[in-house]
């Protein structure tokens, strides 16, 4: 199974959507469909993606291009807020079948190396720390 959360419709070619829709074990949520949802609505949608894949071992890929104004290979003025992404990571870390985190597309520049490094360290610690009790 494969789940895609926050896929940007405007940057995804139609042939990719055609392929995704032809495979029954792929589920996706478009970013554009999530924009007007509340924080709780976004978390519920993310949780439904987790429920789709969490019955067997899985990994989480965090594409930094999906984070608003994050220095990345395809930086965008539209995306998830950093703290929302941290919430997604914390929720995922509670899944016993989540075996790895892959962070990709971060592209620190000379203007932002410290901020990118801090964000990446937040992502890692959010993913590996024990839940608050």
State where each predicted segment sits.
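Residues in the short beta-alpha loop(s) of Rossmann-like NAD(P)-binding domains
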Residues: 8
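Catalytic cores of soluble, metal-dependent hydrolases
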Residues: 3-5, 15, 19, 23-133
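Conserved ATP-utilizing enzyme core subdomain
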Residues: 11-13
């Amino acid at each position: 199974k494969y789940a895609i959360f926050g896929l940007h419709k405007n940057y995804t070619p139609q042939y990719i959507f055609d392929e995704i829709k032809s495979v029954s074990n792929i589920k996706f949520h478009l970013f554009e469909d999530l924009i007007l949802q509340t924080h709780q609505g976004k978390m519920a949608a993310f949780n439904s993606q987790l429920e789709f894949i969490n019955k067997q071992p899985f990994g989480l890929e965090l594409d930094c291009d999906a984070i608003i104004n994050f220095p990345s290979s395809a930086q965008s003025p539209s995306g998830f807020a950093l703290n929302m992404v941290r919430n997604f990571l914390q929720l995922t870390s509670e899944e016993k079948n989540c075996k790895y985190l892959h962070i990709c597309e971060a592209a620190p520049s000379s203007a932002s190396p410290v901020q990118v490094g801090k964000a990446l360290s937040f992502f890692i610690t959010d993913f590996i720390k024990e839940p608050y009790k």
